Structures are given as structure tokens and as C-alpha cells.
Amino acid sequence: MLSPKRVKFRKQQRGRMRGVATRGNTIAFGEFALQAQECGWITSRQIEASRRAMTRYVKRGGKIWIRIFPDKPVTMRAAETRMGSGKGNPEFWVAVIKPGRILFEMGGEEITPEIAKEAMRLAQYKLPVKTKFIALGDEEKTAGAKTPAASKAVTVES
């Protein structure tokens, strides 16, 4: 599973998720992508489950790029622990997702739009946020749109 090798601080505050993604919101490597429609946290386990689902479907046909990385530690206290006595220990890692963020990309000579769409649909079921499938041509047309929800891309909502 994905996690940072080393971090400056072991624990982080939860923070707020406001606005839309300003970075990582365009297709950079492949021809097809899965774009987030709402904000949320995606754990390293969910990223791995999505990756496995896509990889199993496309087999050796193409290449998959993971465009998010879980770099935020989530701490938890032991069950039935009284209040106080500090913050809990880091239990797992999450990636903070904002609307418009590209989560996964897919490309290759053997990857058709139908194969990519089905593989991304399988990955959508593993994720806790609403997403949509976009292709390289669709994404360029919607670059001027203010929000990802306003885009005219091919949508497959989960």
C-alpha cells in the first residue's frame, strides 16, 4: 500500500476541503482518466483496490497511472479509551481529494474507449467519492469550464 517513506511530522490536523482542485486537474500521461466530482479522503487501501480492479480488467493491454498519493496521516485512539491523554497514533494514510482532481489515467495502443470506460467503472465502485470518466479530447474542450461539474465530458457516475 502507498505511504510516505518519511515525514517531517508524524501527526496532522484534519483540515477543511474547500474549493476545486487547481493542480492535477488535467490529463497528463494517458488518453483516458477518472476525475473526482466531489471532495473527500481516499485511503491507500482504496487506491490499491481501484488499481487492482483496473489492472485485472485490462490485463497486459495498457498502462495505468495513479495521480494521487496518500500523504496525510489519520490518527485513531484505542477503543474504549477515556478522553484526554493526547492524540492517537497514526493508523492509515489518506489523499485529500477536491472536485476536478484526476485520480487515475490510462493509456496504450490496445486500450479502446470502451475498455477504459469499463475499467474505470470497476475502479469507481471502490472509491468513496463521485467520479466521472473523461477522455483526452473531452478534457481539452472543458478546460475553460469553472467547475468540473459544468463540463460536457462523457459521464459515468458512481
UniProtKB/Swiss-Prot annotation:
Stored InterPro entries: Ribosomal_uL16, Ribosomal_uL16_bact-type, Ribosomal_uL16_CS, Ribosomal_uL16_dom, Ribosomal_uL16_sf
BP term (GO), one: translation
Positions in coiled-coil regions: none
Keyword Coiled coil applies: no
Keywords: Ribonucleoprotein, Ribosomal protein, RNA-binding, rRNA-binding, tRNA-binding
A GO term for molecular function: tRNA binding
Any one annotated GO CC term: ribosome
Family assignment from sequence similarity: Belongs to the universal ribosomal protein uL16 family.
Functional description taken from the UniProt entry: Binds 23S rRNA and is also seen to make contacts with the A and possibly P site tRNAs.
Protein name: Large ribosomal subunit protein uL16
Organism: Synechococcus sp. (strain CC9902)
Gene: rplP
